Amino acid sequence: MTPFTRHTGLVAPLDRANVDTDQIIPKQFLKSIKRTGFGPNLFDEWRYLDIGEPGRDNSTRPLNPEFVLNFPRYQGASVLLARENFGCGSSREHAPWALDEYGFRTVIAPSFADIFYNNSFKNGLLPIVLAEAQVDALFEQCLTTEGYQLTVDLAAQRVRRPDGVEYGFDIDAFRKHCLLNGLDDIGLTLQDADAIGRFEQGHRARQPWLFGALQ
């Protein structure tokens, strides 16, 4: 998992509340358990004017010119600005996979659905909760300023606007540690690889009959 320390990126404003996981990545794309291939279908039913299907060449599909991520000014955005209850609906890890693969490193909103919030940390996507008034101010600046960027400093737990105004945000210390060091569940386990190896050796020595079929 890519570490997240400090990131400055172009902001895309998704001015919709209660965006659910089926809107983030529609159900027909959930057949795969691989973590790749979902970025092109992020917000599929909003980005395109037709119905998407797995394996289809998206480069030939008609784009929805009224959807924010299709606006030229937001191409290459890596910070998603959203409204309350982002990521609600069914539990699907594919949602943060799609956001991450599209290029978003962080999502800023007044609130998130609990399961989406937890899944985001496990996949290297930083969900930041700010006060609604602060999010409103960011929307206003983003919508009126082309090329609007924000800087997110995870170590300092601050979001800095182009005018120098900063907002602090809370994050669990363990989740912060994992993101700063690029540790997912597998990475955390591998930190104890030596201890696991010693246990396996001792276990095999104490109960060799359990491993007979593996000889």
Curated annotation (Swiss-Prot):
Q: Which GO terms describe its biological process?
A: L-leucine biosynthetic process
Spell out the coiled coil positions from the record: none
Q: Does the keyword Disulfide bond apply?
A: no
Alphabetically sorted, this entry's keywords are:
Amino-acid biosynthesis, Branched-chain amino acid biosynthesis, Leucine biosynthesis, Lyase
Look up keyword Transmembrane helix and say if it applies.
no
Which family is it part of?
Belongs to the LeuD family. LeuD type 1 subfamily.
Quote the function comment for this protein: Catalyzes the isomerization between 2-isopropylmalate and 3-isopropylmalate, via the formation of 2-isopropylmaleate.
| Summary of subunit composition and partner proteins | Heterodimer of LeuC and LeuD.
Q: What is this protein called?
A: 3-isopropylmalate dehydratase small subunit
The source organism is: Xanthomonas axonopodis pv. citri (strain 306)
Query: What is the organism lineage in this UniProt record?
Result: Bacteria, Pseudomonadati, Pseudomonadota, Gammaproteobacteria, Lysobacterales
The gene behind this protein is: leuD
